[in-house]
Each structure stands twice: as structure tokens, then as C-alpha cells.
Design a protein with these regions (language model features):
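A polyanion-binding, active-site-adjacent surface
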Residues: 1-155
Length: 155
């Protein structure tokens, strides 16, 4: 992502593309972005591989103005929050994905003013890729279900 300057282009992006296809959604019709605008990583395998590290709260808060500017420009009706970091960036640090995955959530008024946007939070594709096979299959099905629900929310 960092090298290509686009979100979701690696293994997690390929999983997202497959899930979108299985949900009947054309990625070309979506606005896809990252909640955190920089890539923090740890080098492994003699620097050939970069492992993403979860941003801390300060980094999430620092990037929030850019995310809000994007949302105000795009004016989405439904925002799909992929993972806890994205969800907490808009819904607050107390948000728990495990408790609210798949629910229709009201975005705070400062997110997209004068626009009744809702959100649905679901697992980040990279977290699904890290699960063992039986759990991965179930989490993938949940992701597809949540993506289908986001389409239903459009009416």
C-alpha cells in the first residue's frame, strides 16, 4: 500500500476484492481509504518483508482530520469500517468490534455534517488472513455478510 500509494492492494486487498465480488459489489464504484494515512512497519527477512504494525491512539487521532475531510468530500451514505482501528477512528476509542460487528451504527454528527450517513463495522481483511483455517472461513463469511448488509442499507 505504502509503495503503491493505494489502499488495500496486498494480500488483504485481494481478500477484500474477493469478498466484495462474493457480495456482488463492484470495487470500482467505491471510495476506499485508510483511516490512518501512514504505514508503520517492522522489517523482517533481512528487510525484504514489511509487517504492518497497529497504529497507536495518537496516530489515529492525528490522521482523523484527513479522514473527516475525505468523508465530507465524498458524502457517503454508508461507511464500511474495516477493523477496530477504522471503527475507533470515527466512533471513539471505546468502540469494540467484537460487540458491534455487523450492526448499523450512526456516525457522530461531526463526521459528515448535514448528511445522514450510517456505518457498519466488520473485520479487517488482514485480521481474517491471520486466523486459522476454520475460523478464517467463518470470519470471511461474516465479512461477505456485512458487505451485503451495507448494500441493503443503501435501500
Amino acid at each position: 500500500e505504502d509503495r503503491r500509494g493505494q489502499p488495500f492492494v496486498g494480500p488483504a486487498g485481494r481478500l477484500l476484492d474477493r469478498a466484495l465480488g462474493d457480495a456482488g459489489i463492484d470495487r470500482g464504484r467505491l471510495y476506499v481509504t485508510n483511516a490512518v494515512k501512514h504505514f508503520k512497519f517492522k522489517a523482517t527477512d533481512r528487510g525484504k518483508r514489511r509487517i504492518h504494525q497497529k497504529p497507536n491512539r495518537t496516530e489515529v487521532v492525528a490522521c482523523r482530520p484527513w479522514l473527516l475531510a475525505e468523508l465530507r468530500t465524498v458524502e457517503p451514505h454508508v461507511v464500511v469500517l474495516l477493523g477496530a482501528t477504522a471503527a475507533q477512528s470515527l466512533l471513539g476509542n471505546d468502540f469494540r468490534l467484537t460487540q458491534h460487528r455487523g450492526e448499523t451504527l450512526q456516525l457522530p454528527p461531526d463526521t459528515v455534517p448535514d448528511h445522514d450517513a450510517v456505518a457498519i463495522a466488520t473485520a479487517h481483511p488482514s485480521s481474517i488472513l491471520r486466523l486459522p483455517s476454520p475460523d478464517r472461513d467463518a470470519a470471511y463469511r461474516d465479512l461477505v455478510t456485512d458487505l451485503q448488509r451495507s448494500v441493503e442499507l443503501l435501500g
